[in-house]
């Protein structure tokens, strides 16, 4: 009988909090913020599912690299409308890993 070892996935419980400038995605009506820390070091993986807030508005998304020098998280148009902010504005962000 073969016994498989199940890897225990690491889950980071820390809440990260920072202020960031909203950046514009070139050629489309998209926006994102850059993550100001080393995501691979903090979460032990490259793409991370997170629960985030932008000025207190909830969002579930992922920290990703999209041909950018660092990880980013997108800010949907409806969230930008809800917080009345656009590219160039500063936003308060919280990020916590989710399962």
Regions found by a protein language model. Give the residues of each.
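Beta-strand/loop nucleic-acid-binding surfaces
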Residues: 73
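Short alpha-helix capping/helix-loop boundary micro-motifs
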Residues: 76-81
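Long, compositionally biased stretches
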Residues: 3-70, 87-99
């Amino acid at each position: 009988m073969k016994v498989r070892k199940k890897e225990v996935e690491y889950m980071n419980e820390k809440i990260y909090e920072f202020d960031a400038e909203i950046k514009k995605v070139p050629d489309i009506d998209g926006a994102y913020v850059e993550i100001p820390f080393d995501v691979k070091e903090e979460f032990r993986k490259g793409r991370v599912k997170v629960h985030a807030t932008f000025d207190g508005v909830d969002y579930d998304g992922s920290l990703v690299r999209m041909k950018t020098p660092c990880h980013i998280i997108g800010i949907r148009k409806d969230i930008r409308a809800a917080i009345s902010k656009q590219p160039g504005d500063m936003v308060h962000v919280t990020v916590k890993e989710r399962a």
